[in-house]
UniProtKB/Swiss-Prot annotation:
Organism listed in the record: Xenopus laevis
Keywords: Aminoacyl-tRNA synthetase, ATP-binding, Ligase, Membrane, Mitochondrion, Nucleotide-binding, Protein biosynthesis, Transit peptide
Function, as annotated: Catalyzes the attachment of arginine to tRNA(Arg) in a two-step reaction: arginine is first activated by ATP to form Arg-AMP and then transferred to the acceptor end of tRNA(Arg).
Domain of life from the UniProt record: Eukaryota
Chain positions of motif 'HIGH' region: 136-147
UniProt gene name: rars2
GO BP terms: arginyl-tRNA aminoacylation; mitochondrial translation
Identification of the protein by name: Probable arginine--tRNA ligase, mitochondrial
Amino acid sequence: MAWHFRRVIAEQVSRVLGLPSESCSRVAQCIQTVPVHRKHESPDFQLFMTSLSEGGPNGTFSNQEERAEQLAGKLVCDSVISDIGTTRGSVTFKINRDLLTRNVLQQISKDGSLYGLNTELFSELSRRKTIVEYSSPNIAKKFHVGHLRSTIIGNFIANLKQAVGNEVVRINYLGDWGLQFGLLGAGFSSFGSKEKLLANPLQHLFEVYVKVNTAAEKDNGIKLSAQEFLRRLEGGDPHALSLWMHFRDISIQEYAKIYKRLGAHFDDYSGESFYKEKSQEVLKQLESKGLLLKTDKGTVIDLSEEGNLSSYSTVMRSDGTSLYITRDMAAAVDRMERYNFDEMIYVTDKSQKNHFQQLFKILKIMGKDQADRCQHVPFGLVQGMKTRRGEVVFLEDVLDEARSRMLQNMAASETSKQLDDPSDTAEKIGIAALIVQDFKGQLVSDYHFDWDQALQSTGDTGVFLQYTHARLHSLQALRCPRDTEDFEIASLREPCVIATLQHLLRYDEVIYKCLEDLQPRYLVTYLLSLGHLANVAHRTLQVKGSSSEAAHARLLFFKNVQMVLGNGMKLLGITPVNNM
């Protein structure tokens, strides 16, 4: 909604400055929002004179102040703009407070879950077909903490793209092929147990993998057996394929339990195995174009600009078996043909940056136009994530720990309510804590995880967001708001209400910024600020004991704040709780 008011201001500024009508959009982009204050009113928008200068800032500070005074003197207040002022070389604008209140509350009530997504800001965005590949664990291995980041980041990006109207395909590209599976397949006959596999599938397969890796370091024969098992797999050996399929099926069944806890889902479970044959077709295409070179270590493709192999990628081992990048090439080509996507986003840790740079370059060399539509979203490492028992290895341990700690905190709290399912509520709050802690900074940055900090109910945490949402929801039990077209604006003129409405006005711009950068931190910061503003308003505004008209207006206000807070939390992948 903020863009609408920017445009109204920009139209008047453009007229006064004698600018052509096509300049209005550029002027609107120069108009900035003013930081919201919780306890006193501030203007809504600000236009710095330097931003209107062609080629950037010019002139002295006093010149800019004088220009601001001159421009402000020519502008007039109207039904939209109630006050025009100047400060530090800029012109400030205050929106008519009654108009702001009525427009924001009515728009939220009308749009519901779509609030902020139907504004002018998004009107010119084309609806696209988006593929998001994320999570992508290696089968027969338990989730580790890195999979938490890939899963929740990918889920957020997919949610965001879907929210703005894109057709989104969520792909879980399983690591279900390659030499590591050769090791597991060869090692299961020596270290595996059908009984243990049935009792705790992923834990037992992990134990087998550790044992066979340790043994392979001392016995080269085991490495050779692993290579032989992989060759048998790629050759279609029935016994090897049967064992592989069994491990794959039970892995997906176990992963589904984790995804359910995280609120993640996928449209397509594919994997490297799907492309073992297609990868050979891709290699033939490259060979027919004279792009492959054979070396002692395998077959490579030259990626250097000079053609001197200063940069290259190995696409086939010397024994003829395929590599991870070969299967990724085949997967990308297949998706281009199958989905005809507008963009494909890969979400992995930053250590794979070079891999994706090579992949996209190879696709370009192959003449695939959609290579330019591929993007890698890298993320950093989580450090210091431990349970009470010690260093965490598996994601399941982290989720259990979050639930356990929240149950303890809820039991110790004097304000906790009687809940139908305390464990489920604790799980949702704990996962909110993990997501907010993860999303606060730049995704590519490493960060140190702190349980005590993440689970605070009063700081900038997921627990605080859940607490605020539940608190706002509890107000609705007092009285049901009536028709949103008719409410007493005079009961909503306190500075804390205006500050909250100013913040709600800017929701669409925050979503747009997230869409530009694919970074959730903007939305996290916005929601935390909204939570603090809502709590100030909750302490200030009286509902009980006020007149029917005042109570109705204030309950409508709180209901709409709760709706936007909940909408934003859902975009992040958080399930809001109504009681805690």
